[in-house]
Amino acid sequence: MTDRPNILWYCTDQQRFDTIGALGNPHVRTPGLDDLVRSGTAFTHTYCQSPICTPSRASFMSGLYPSRVHNTRNGNESFPEWPPVITKLIADAGYDCGMIGKFHLQSAGKRTEPRIEDGFRYWKFSHAPRDDWKEGHDYADWVRERGGDLNRLRESEDRVPTELHQTTWASERAIEFIRQTGKKPWLLNLNVYDPHPPFIPPKSYADQFDPSEMPGPHFEKSDLEAQAKLADCDFQDEVRSPEEHDAKGAQARYYAMIAQIDDQFGRILQTLDETGQRDNTVIVFTSDHGESLGDHGLMYKGCRFYEGLVRVPLIFSWPRRFLKNQQSDALVEMMDLSATLLELSGVPLPDYFQGKSLLPILTGQSDASEHRNFVRSEYFDALDPHFTGGSGTYATMHRTQTHKLCVYHGKGVGELFDLANDPWEHRNLWDDPIHSKIKNQLIAESFDAHVLLTTDVGSKRIAPM
């Protein structure tokens, strides 16, 4: 593009797709995001390439599936030297790039996450809102400067107050970055920790959401039996009924965290208006993966591919160039966000790139209901046994317009859902002989896709022999 805009890229952590009022949830409070939906395009069927933080982020930061970039686990020692992350490519193209919050392409356990060639001039790190890092944790330093003690506040009845919250800190740093930018176009990658567990919003927000008024999770009693068959597949928490999980209470606290995110996100947009930069700034709102929140008797995340866990919000707004108030139900992968950002910043897509730009839909040049024939997600030994008690699971999801196939490799189990008739995935058709034809067809399609899309054939061929 000859007209290169600024890019505000706001990424939450573990936020489900169905948590925005304007997209059909009457129980949340998201006026800022509702306005963003009306001012742009919401891709309502966007899927992450792993239901776990690091492999998902590795994928959309590189434009490759996690297994292709060889970064499939949380807690990994290092990030590969190749491929370059997209922010490095964008910085090399002349953008002033900033990062606030969590990056999580490598382990931040017992250490500050090491920097890579990431392209960021402005770097304000905070992996999580805990005081667990001796150095390099900008948020903890910010809290201490204001007389706060993070660990004590987190354990108090009122939790961390809004004025000292990580989400507030992130907005303060974003406002600082936006106000100090010069003549170069800029990209700000802002990554807040919420609504990631533990679900501990400030009391002032928690009090706004009554658990008794929550709709509760998507759960049927048959889910308990279905999950028993998958008991050998990694997950962070035990299968329980909604009552045992206090699912409505968790939902209320989760929505409270999102309400706070919405308010702080609005402060950043107000700064864009005040500085006269709104018209030339593309705004993107998304998340790295979802949250089970009691669906199917599950809480948190792990080796499953249910809609609440792998489907995420993705909203683009740039009223100057993009269509307004458009909702696209096309199948989208998070790598497509990466391709779109490269195209917006004038960076040619590398020949290895697996993302597909969304600009034709955003600008009305292509059908908003068509983008990909299928989307994929992977879980390859992604969580440490410390979190799951398991021994490492390998699984893949292949989702078409009508069906979802999940194969738990080496376990002898799988899932097949007819999404047109069972959108919340309560009836597993894997063992139903009536559906054996479509199951076998999808297994073949998924195998082909895995071989063709994730096989690394090695170095470049330079001669016939």
Regions found by a protein language model. Give the residues of each.
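Short arginine-rich
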Residues: 451-455
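Formylglycine-dependent sulfatase
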Residues: 1-408, 413-414, 423-448, 458-465
